[in-house]
């Protein structure tokens, strides 16, 4: 860990606990800061807050009183999920108090360079692929962020010869000041998180913060097939490395002659790749680009692609019951992810979908319903998904209250040779704490059918 003195004896407010807030508060105390921790949940229900209080921190729970800002606060470290419209953040901004997220702290203390990966979809798969390729290539990667360990915990122990690979959301990237990844990858952009950002434009600008501090000594890995991403890459001063699944890229990554190429050199045959889904070729090209920029050999990349079958909750094969194959795609928290999941199958499919209502309709899914024989909806968005299914002309449409019920109904509507797919097209927070919990409950419900 770098020797950092900028936080010593400073009053720093950590807003929102959870895993990242807990880690940030613990680190800041270690760095000599006077840490004030604030969380909306009452202290009696807040185990993490009680632990921080036991460590000697000033803990205020049960709301976000504006009076906290009267304590000569020099920095606010906020949980990524707390919107900037929260009154305490509005007031902090008016007082010109810097507001950052935990990944910013991680960067400031890390001896190791960062690889940052963002996009509307494919972040987790690309991050895991990158990690595995760097590991196979003996580049000493450590994984952090939305998957793996909280970034500032990883960064404390990361050495100069290691690489911190981190998946970054728009929420995290809104709170960066100095964060400068050696390699920044921007995979794709489409309309999402409008309840948080307001517009697609603001959402895209938040993600473009990944380029904010890059220089000509850094690299920006860009999806050449996404016009929005290409436009936002103008914010990068780094060396741009493009990837495309639709056209040849001489100075980047592409597919030609049924093989993946990087800067004109064949890296791997498409036939050697075991990860299913056409959409995953984009993720592979991005990860391959990062790996090649960091000096990983073609042999190491090929070895990973011959064994990497995917990540949990992302088109995860669960089991086969009476010749019906069950897939868990709980990580599909938006329409684009579900579109890609549906495109991965040619068999008749029974779709389970629904979740948190973020204000969007689901008509964009209609062209992808061509192999969907039945849909079972649940959660807040069930009525909207029913409307889309009716417009698509589906014969079998059913709504239920719980995911357990949805699994039973989906099986009842299936026949020999069908795929039964959980791909919600929505966030999970209306009924579940996380998409992981939703996926685990789906898997448990499937096994109850046996």
From Swiss-Prot:
Localization of this protein: Cytoplasm
A Pfam cross-reference name: MurD-like_N
Keyword annotations: ATP-binding, Cell cycle, Cell division, Cell shape, Cell wall biogenesis/degradation, Cytoplasm, Ligase, Nucleotide-binding, Peptidoglycan synthesis
InterPro entries cross-referenced by the UniProt entry: Mur-like_cat_sf (IPR036565), Mur_ligase_C (IPR004101), Mur_ligase_C_dom_sf (IPR036615), Mur_ligase_cen (IPR013221), MurD (IPR005762)
GO molecular function annotations of the record: ATP binding; UDP-N-acetylmuramoylalanine-D-glutamate ligase activity
Cellular component per GO, a single term: cytoplasm
Main location: cytoplasm
Catalytic activities: UDP-N-acetyl-alpha-D-muramoyl-L-alanine + D-glutamate + ATP = UDP-N-acetyl-alpha-D-muramoyl-L-alanyl-D-glutamate + ADP + phosphate + H(+)
EC number: 6.3.2.9
Gene Ontology BP annotations: cell division; cell wall organization; peptidoglycan biosynthetic process; regulation of cell shape
Name of the top EC class for this enzyme: ligase
Binding site for ATP: 119-125
Pathway annotation: Cell wall biogenesis; peptidoglycan biosynthesis
Protein origin, superkingdom: Bacteria
Family the UniProt entry places it in: Belongs to the MurCDEF family.
Known function: Cell wall formation. Catalyzes the addition of glutamate to the nucleotide precursor UDP-N-acetylmuramoyl-L-alanine (UMA).
HAMAP family xref list: MurD
Designated name of the protein: UDP-N-acetylmuramoylalanine--D-glutamate ligase
Species in which this protein is naturally found: Bacillus cereus (strain Q1)
